[in-house]
């Protein structure tokens, strides 16, 4: 087992009950274009078109052959675009049960599949988009080969679902999915799970299981990659989430695209935090209807540390998100708040009484408790960064855009989620995720 000591389990109220309930009926789903870094769509449908589940909606011009398929059947209700016609979302009004069928295989045939058969079925069904590269966190090219594939079967994000609960319901599909992935490449398939977690595996020669323990970010793929198979400019690995492995197993067994998602609905503003069964890309406001405390709330697709605000054209569950988090908007200001002991506020430093209340769960808000200021290196980044890098120096380079130094300090190993805790504890109130993305884009473009 690999146990990390540095990190932080956020003591946030509203942790979900780890029991799966059926979610509400969803009448609108969407694919969010801005989730796919660098993607430029070539649209295959227009508003008003009827689509079947599994039908191609658009293809990536910059990554030919990578197609994005409809998670449900229905009609194209809207295609939202932002500045410079950047695709924001393709919205589908759910109607009927028409679907496209893909290749299916008998259980005993899965162990003998060729890599080309696996690749073709994943690409045609749209499940190829479940894979992401590291570095750069992009969908891999259809003819690319990884050094390894990392299956993330654990989640240490605040308010997250326990993967063991989800996998237990679909253990056979998860095993089949692992077997299919083992046929995609001869390289290692690293299955990463929590210490002692009951996660099934397969007896394929290239599948290895690893256990991780410790606080968040022990459950992030970036942490797993760093300790098992570090990447660089000339070494790329792929990552995939456990629920997508289940979907792959079901696709190859039945020939049908599985777009079901089990998500955690949690946070201090949720009346009954719990796990819900819904669909990929579901309209978030329909999921949360009647579920929230009547207040000024911020609804987030994903983790409170690194999720996306859901509103307008973005009011949909993200492709790579397994949770919806709800906290209160922190619009009020306190007069001389820094003087009070503040037992109801949490800080990683010893500046509030809440820091010393070890078993207390706090009602976090969106308030950052201060304005923008200079980066202050007081050791907070080192306390939450378990990777073998120099976080203060790296974060400084991200702020000033020094790509050469940032690359030398290990930025290619990282994704936005890997720096979310650094943003949370930053005295200067910097958001390091967008700064990292900007540097990665520059490195990819200019080398």
Curated annotation (Swiss-Prot):
Keyword NAD: yes
Taxonomic lineage from the root: Bacteria, Pseudomonadati, Pseudomonadota, Betaproteobacteria, Neisseriales
Organism per entry: Neisseria meningitidis serogroup A / serotype 4A (strain DSM 15465 / Z2491)
Gene Ontology biological process terms from the UniProt entry: sodium ion transport
Complex and partners: Composed of six subunits; NqrA, NqrB, NqrC, NqrD, NqrE and NqrF.
Family to which the UniProt record says this protein belongs: Belongs to the NqrA family.
Name recorded for this polypeptide: Na(+)-translocating NADH-quinone reductase subunit A
E.C. numbers: 7.2.1.1
Keywords linked to the UniProt accession: Ion transport, NAD, Sodium, Sodium transport, Translocase, Transport, Ubiquinone
Chain's gene name: nqrA
UniProt cross-references to Gene3D superfamilies, sorted A to Z: 2.40.50.100
Alphabetical list of InterPro entries matching this protein: NqrA, NQRA_2nd, NqrA_C_domain, NQRA_N
Function: NQR complex catalyzes the reduction of ubiquinone-1 to ubiquinol by two successive reactions, coupled with the transport of Na(+) ions from the cytoplasm to the periplasm. NqrA to NqrE are probably involved in the second step, the conversion of ubisemiquinone to ubiquinol.
């Amino acid at each position: 087992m690999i146990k990390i000591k540095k990190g932080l389990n956020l003591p946030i109220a509203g942790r979900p009950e780890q029991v799966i309930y059926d979610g509400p009926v969803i009448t609108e789903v969407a694919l969010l274009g801005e989730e796919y870094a660098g993607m430029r769509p070539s649209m295959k449908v227009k508003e008003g078109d009827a689509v079947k589940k599994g039908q191609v909606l658009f293809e990536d011009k910059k990554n030919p052959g990578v197609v994005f398929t409809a998670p449900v059947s229905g009609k194209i209700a809207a295609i939202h675009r932002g500045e410079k016609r950047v695709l924001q979302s393709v919205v589908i009004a759910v109607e009927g049960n028409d679907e496209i069928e893909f290749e299916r295989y008998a259980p005993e045939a899965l162990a003998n599949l060729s890599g080309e058969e696996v690749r073709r079925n994943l690409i045609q069904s749209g499940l190829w988009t479940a894979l992401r590269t590291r570095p750069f966190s992009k969908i891999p090219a259809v003819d690319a080969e990884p050094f390894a594939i990392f299956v993330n079967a654990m989640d240490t994000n605040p308010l997250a679902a326990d993967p063991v609960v989800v996998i237990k319901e679909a253990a056979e599909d998860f095993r089949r999915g692992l077997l299919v992935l083992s046929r995609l490449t001869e390289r290692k398939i690293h299955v990463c799970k929590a210490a002692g977690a009951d996660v099934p595996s397969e007896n394929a020669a290239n599948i290895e299981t690893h256990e991780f323990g410790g606080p968040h970010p022990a459950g992030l793929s970036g942490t797993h990659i760093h300790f098992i198979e570090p990447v660089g400019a000339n070494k790329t690995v792929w990552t995939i989430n456990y629920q997508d492995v289940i979907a792959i197993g079901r696709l190859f067994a039945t020939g049908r695209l599985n777009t079901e998602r089990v998500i955690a609905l949690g946070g201090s503003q949720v009346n009954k935090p719990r796990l819900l069964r819904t669909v990929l890309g579901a309209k978030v406001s329909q999921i949360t209807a009647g579920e929230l405390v009547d207040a000024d709330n911020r609804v987030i697709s994903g983790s409170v540390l690194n999720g996306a605000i859901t509103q307008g054209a973005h009011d949909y569950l993200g492709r790579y998100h397994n949770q919806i988090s709800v906290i209160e908007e922190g619009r009020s200001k306190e007069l001389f708040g820094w003087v009070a002991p503040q037992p109801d506020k949490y800080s990683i430093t010893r500046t509030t009484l809440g820091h010393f209340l070890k078993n207390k769960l706090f009602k976090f808000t969106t308030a950052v408790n201060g304005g923008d200021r200079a980066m202050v290196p007081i050791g907070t980044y080192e306390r939450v960064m378990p990777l073998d890098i120099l976080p203060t120096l790296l974060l400084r380079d991200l702020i000033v855009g020094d790509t050469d130094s940032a690359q030398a300090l290990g930025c290619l190993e990282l994704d936005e989620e890997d720096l979310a805790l650094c943003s949370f504890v930053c005295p200067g109130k910097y958001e390091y995720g967008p700064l990292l993305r900007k540097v990665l884009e520059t490195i990819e473009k200019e080398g």
